[in-house]
Amino acid sequence: MRIGLFTDTYCPQINGVATSVNMLKKGLEKKGNTVYLVTVNPDKYEYSIEENGKVLRLPGVPVKIYDYKLASVYPLKAINIIKKWKLDVIHSHTEFGVGTFARIIATQFGIPLVHTYHTMYEDYVHYITHGYFNWSSKKIVEYLTLFYCDKTNTELIVPTVKAC
């Protein structure tokens, strides 16, 4: 099977999503699958292709949360590369730039989309609001999460009981 993993964070970044995606990639490859990965370039604002053409890094702009970078939701240069991969399934691991791009590509090319919901964002709202508007911010985040997760997913994976 030809699987495309789409994520905003990946090695060399150190966080739970990057680690989960890396472990999933290795496990799928061990089972004989061909795994491609689309992620944000953590170092430079440019495209790069690594691991014999199987990892595509997109340009991203820094945001003020951790070492996070946000990619375009429709990076034109990436489309032809991904089209050549002839993916059987797309598995997104983010609700932001690269995840939205995964949804668009899945719809555009008629590829089944699986999404893993890794982060309980309402538990992190206080880092951004600094205690102001916590209740309303949590409600907005809950709504946006439901909106995102209910749309265009063939399958939704929620790895914690709390998230159900």
Identify what each model region corresponds to.
Residues M1-P59, I82:
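N-terminal subdomain of nucleotide-sugar transferases
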Residues Y45, I90-D123:
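An aromatic- and histidine-rich active-site surface loop
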Residues N52-R57, Q108-G110, G131-W135:
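Short, hinge-like loop/turn segments at secondary-structure boundaries
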Residues G60, K64-V89, V98-I104, Q108, ...:
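An amphipathic, basic-hydrophobic alpha-helix
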Residues G60, V114-F147:
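Acceptor-binding helix/loop patch of EC 2.4 sugar-transfer enzymes
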Residues Q108, S137-E155, A163-C164:
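Membrane-proximal helix-turn-helix segments that form the acceptor-binding/catalytic region
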